[in-house]
Amino acid sequence: MADNAHYWVLLVYTFVVIALVAGMIGVSHFLGQRHLKRATIEPFESGIVTVGYARFRLPVQFYLIAMFFVIFDLEAAYLYAWATAVHAAGWTGYLVIAVFILALLAALAYLWRAGALEWGPKPRALAIVRRR
């Protein structure tokens, strides 16, 4: 009987979440605006009239920096998990995390050497332009 209690709690929780989401969507549908004029379609940003088109392509460097952040942020989570259990891990855990940190440093050195962290023009391209 005690094992089934966990399933009932999960079922009730799922039902409550679905009912809450459906209720929020329903209330916003019934209370929301029904007309689509030019003034209601445009975004309102601190009373400033919008200028230009907001959907433009970002340079690829933004994508690369975001990917590097996600990758190195996950490693920070692993390091935090190791730091909370450092006494239980012992010397074996210390050696494993040392290898892990060395792999991180090698990856960072590779990215730095490959120029993935550079935002400006490539130095090689600048040298070619200066020779002309």
Curated annotation (Swiss-Prot):
Bilayer disposition of the protein:
Multi-pass membrane protein
| UniProt cross-references to InterPro entries, sorted A to Z | NAD(P)H_OxRDtase_bac/plastid, NADH_UbQ/plastoQ_OxRdtase_su3, NDAH_ubi_oxred_su3_sf
Name the EC number(s): 7.1.1.-
- Which of the seven top EC classes does this enzyme belong to? translocase
Q: From the Swiss-Prot or TrEMBL record, state where the protein is found.
A: Cell inner membrane
Cell inner membrane listed as a keyword: yes
Keywords from the named record = Cell inner membrane, Cell membrane, Membrane, NAD, Quinone, Translocase, Transmembrane, Transmembrane helix, Transport, Ubiquinone
**UniProt function note:** NDH-1 shuttles electrons from NADH, via FMN and iron-sulfur (Fe-S) centers, to quinones in the respiratory chain. The immediate electron acceptor for the enzyme in this species is believed to be ubiquinone. Couples the redox reaction to proton translocation (for every two electrons transferred, four hydrogen ions are translocated across the cytoplasmic membrane), and thus conserves the redox energy in a proton gradient.
Tell me how this protein assembles.
NDH-1 is composed of 14 different subunits. Subunits NuoA, H, J, K, L, M, N constitute the membrane sector of the complex.
Identification of the protein by name:
NADH-quinone oxidoreductase subunit A
